[in-house]
Every structure is written in C-alpha cells, then in structure tokens.
Amino acid sequence: MARYRCCRSRSRCRRRRRRCHRRRRRCSRRRRRRVCCRRYTVIRCRRR
C-alpha cells in the first residue's frame, strides 16, 4: 500500500513532483489529523 502524507499546499507538492489528491478516508485513524483529511495528500511520499 502506498504511504500517504499531508500536503499543506499544491505548490509544495508540485515542487517535489508529486501528485496531491484530496482523500478523506486516507486519514490515519491513529493520528487523527484533520489536515490530512481536508488538505491534500501526497502519494508515495518519503518520510523525513
């Protein structure tokens, strides 16, 4: 399964050449982050 990460803005996602998609179900249940649900998520994003 692909890892999803929060993206604050589309521009940031574009910089990393990643695609941002709006997904509500992709919000991790353990980390209840509304940002992930409301904002954009990056597919195949590496963790820092």
From Swiss-Prot:
GO biological-process terms attached to the record: chromosome condensation; sperm DNA condensation
Subcellular locations according to the entry: Nucleus; Chromosome
Main location: nucleus
The keyword Transferase is annotated on this UniProt entry: no
SS bond list: none
Keyword Nucleus listed: yes
GO cellular component, one term: nucleus
UniProt keyword terms in alphabetical order: Chromosome, Developmental protein, Differentiation, DNA condensation, DNA-binding, Nucleosome core, Nucleus, Spermatogenesis
Pfam family, one: Protamine_P1
Free-text tissue specificity from the UniProt record: Testis.
Family that this chain belongs to: Belongs to the protamine P1 family.
Protein known as: Sperm protamine P1
Organism per entry: Murina cyclotis (Round-eared tube-nosed bat)
Gene from which this protein is expressed: PRM1
